[in-house]
Amino acid sequence: MSINLNQIKQDLTQITNDVLTAANLRRGDIFVLGCSTSEVVGGHIGKASSREVGATIIETLLEILKPLDIQLAVQGCEHINRSLVMERSVAEAHDFEIVSVVPAMHAGGACSVAAFEQYSDPVEVEHTVAHAGLDIGDTAIGMHVKFVQVPVRPSLDTLGAAHVTALRSRPKYVGGPRATYDI
């Protein structure tokens, strides 16, 4: 499959803006990305990673999220236990467990590699509690999005050849028959 990087950027911008609108994030919130560039280019997850596509995806997300002061955490593959790349300042501010690994194309994936290259002081963390996230290629980001997770359906459900889903979170409803939830 031939990939048009400009189209990837355009579609990803639309998808991300849809998720941001639904998630109603605030400054400092964490947005997690799970992405298989193999799936984006029409391959099987983990079998056709694209450094070019990974770099384009991370660059595009940072262009959108940085001005909003929303922090991007990029999930790696199972070969690095789905650890995430984030800026050291974010990891330290949230007291996330920093782990010793540097992502590679086939141990972390192209987006993790791109994030590690594009961040100013990248680290890998074992786990995060994001407020929303984007899953490109069915990579399973749910373990990194805080409860209660709510599916978001962006206006586009594919990026390249990859299936796209998203999550936002909301506070848990607690109480009994007398409780109200609207303020």
UniProtKB/Swiss-Prot annotation:
It comes from the Bacteria. Gene3D superfamilies: Hypothetical protein TT1679. InterPro entries: Antibiotic_NAT-like, DUF436. Pfam families: DUF436. SUPFAM superfamilies: TTHA0583/YokD-like (SSF110710). Belongs to the UPF0340 family. This is UPF0340 protein LCA_1354. It comes from Latilactobacillus sakei subsp. sakei (strain 23K) (Lactobacillus sakei subsp. sakei). The lineage of its organism: Bacteria, Bacillati, Bacillota, Bacilli, Lactobacillales.
